[in-house]
Amino acid sequence: MGQKVNPTGIRLGITKPFASTWFASNKDFASNLDGDHKVREFLKEKLKRASLSKVVIERPAKSIRVTIHTARPGVVIGKKGEDVEKLRLAVSKIAGVPAQINIAEVRKPEMDAQLVADSIASQLERRVMFRRAMKRAVQNAMRLGAKGIKVQVSGRLGGADIARAEWYREGRVPLHTLRADIDYAIARGNTTYGVIGIKVWIFKGEIIGNMPLQAEVPAAKPKRKTNRKPK
């Protein structure tokens, strides 16, 4: 039975950038990695209602620079920048180095896989029918220009006794094509019947610019065989 590799992991360094961009020596690598994980978990918990898409971390010269991608930057920044200053102090305390916080707005949340997955999870927790939530997410993404989208939910759907998985797809989602820009995310909805897992794949088009294109060489014409004897 065929298994699916993580679409983001297999494209790292090809068409997908890394979420943490820094270099460290062997003795500092583990502590930096642990710090990144703690910072992400803290921001994910703190910014639950801010439609958090992703967190990009850089570490220039004994400091940390965190870029928060969100669909609701006003919620993150707060009144006169008070909330973002609290976040900066908290991140600095967790990482143990001076911190800088940047906010990047997600213009089309319907085209962001993480925000779509979180939205479906939120609807399932509010007892919205799972098929309606899936179909609405697919229609919104296709309306805003996605080339294809696939949504899968699994668990005790509708309170059924036996867990199952259901998916809905529209357009094309070429997971084998490495130049395809596939946005992938997972989320979990905690319902009264148990945990519902949500997976979202969004195909936004193909990325050609970062890949070296080979020049096409015309094939040589086959030589015609003759049976004539030399005179």
UniProtKB/Swiss-Prot annotation:
It comes from the Bacteria. The keyword rRNA-binding applies. GO terms for molecular function: mRNA binding; rRNA binding; structural constituent of ribosome. SMART domains: KH (SM00322). InterPro entries: KH_dom (IPR004087), KH_dom-like_a/b (IPR015946), KH_dom_type_2 (IPR004044), KH_sf_prok-type (IPR009019), Ribosomal_S3_C_sf (IPR036419), Ribosomal_uS3_bac-typ (IPR005704), Ribosomal_uS3_C (IPR001351), Ribosomal_uS3_CS (IPR018280). Keywords: Ribonucleoprotein, Ribosomal protein, RNA-binding, rRNA-binding. GO terms for cellular component: cytosolic small ribosomal subunit. GO terms for biological process: translation. Pfam families: KH_2, Ribosomal_S3_C. Residues 39-107 form the KH type-2 domain. Belongs to the universal ribosomal protein uS3 family. Binds the lower part of the 30S subunit head. Binds mRNA in the 70S ribosome, positioning it for translation. Part of the 30S ribosomal subunit. Forms a tight complex with proteins S10 and S14. This is Small ribosomal subunit protein uS3. It comes from Colwellia psychrerythraea (strain 34H / ATCC BAA-681) (Vibrio psychroerythus).
